[in-house]
């Protein structure tokens, strides 16, 4: 597996499906409520609107009702990112444990000391890296995972909203703050 590191300039990063409007984003509150107890714990940002639309229903209540907000994600300062273009991530049936072990080994090869027992994304926070890979939806869309502990430089911008009634998404409309 090949990984490369890049520097992202401040500016638009992608899209985020949220239960809240952009004006209600609070990175301090998010960090206090977020858990870092999983390999992939983080703040997920879709590279395209199409990819992110798929997460809109996750923003509803248990009956499938509510309003989901598609916000534009900006970063306020430059950030370092690890890019993984391994196409095996595109498959939802791929053995993720094997991929995870390969990622950790590849990170060690580029001198980022991640132990096999370390949780991947939370550990990358210590070294101030985001992670980018393909989404597992058989597409060419990628997502950027910002470790929960690094969301201080995230700013959300109002973009679109969608009302859901009994799990059915209504017309997507633009919204302002």
PLM regions: where:
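Active-site and NAD+-binding cores of ADP-ribose-processing enzymes
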Residues: 1-39, 49, 56, 60-177
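Active-site nucleophilic cysteine motif
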Residues: 41-44
